[in-house]
Design a protein with these regions (language model features):
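N-terminal membrane-targeting/pre-transmembrane regions
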Residues: 1-34, 116-118, 126, 130-133
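Non-transmembrane, membrane-adjacent beta-strand/coil modules in membrane-associated proteins
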Residues: 58, 72-135
Length: 153
């Protein structure tokens, strides 16, 4: 395996979305603390959990090497797909991620696909393997598929 990826893409969540999530979680932690009086630990717990979730899903990173495709979400999730198992790749426009997958992130779709999607990125590739069909977010789906096809040939 070469150390440099043939194709690489980083998809970050937009900052207003993160700010909204953080403010919502802070309010959920702060309001009960104020009402119940002095439960500062509840606010600290919600804040820590929110920061952990944001760090875990802030960035989706896609790297294609000669022998494998690696998709990483934050610090904890990593999916490896061997190039030899890839059958077909095509650009794909997600019509409605909330309806099909119930949101963004790591999801199983109602249509049987396995989605690895980033918030507010509706362009993707559809990657077929013998076991599963993956939908992977990409801001440049044509380039991503071209890179996969060049590695396959």
């Amino acid at each position: 395996m070469s150390s440099m990826p043939i194709y690489e893409e980083r998809l970050n969540v937009n900052y207003p979305f993160i700010g909204g999530i953080f403010l919502f979680a802070l309010a959920v932690g702060l309001i009960p603390s104020i009402i119940l009086g002095g439960l500062w630990w509840l606010t600290a717990l919600y804040t820590a959990l929110t920061i952990g979730i944001i760090v875990s899903f802030f960035q989706m990173r896609v790297e294609l090497f000669e022998d494998k495709l690696i998709i990483k979400f934050g610090l904890f999730y990593r999916k490896v797909i061997e190039v030899e198992k890839m059958q077909d790749c095509s650009p794909y426009k997600m019509p409605h991620p909330m309806r099909t997958y119930g949101g963004w992130g790591i999801r199983k779709g109602r249509d049987g696909t396995f989605a690895l999607t980033q918030a507010f990125v509706n362009e993707a590739i559809k990657l077929e393997t013998p076991e599963k069909t993956f939908v992977i977010s990409s801001r440049r789906p044509e380039s991503f598929c071209s890179a996969i096809k060049s590695v396959k040939s």
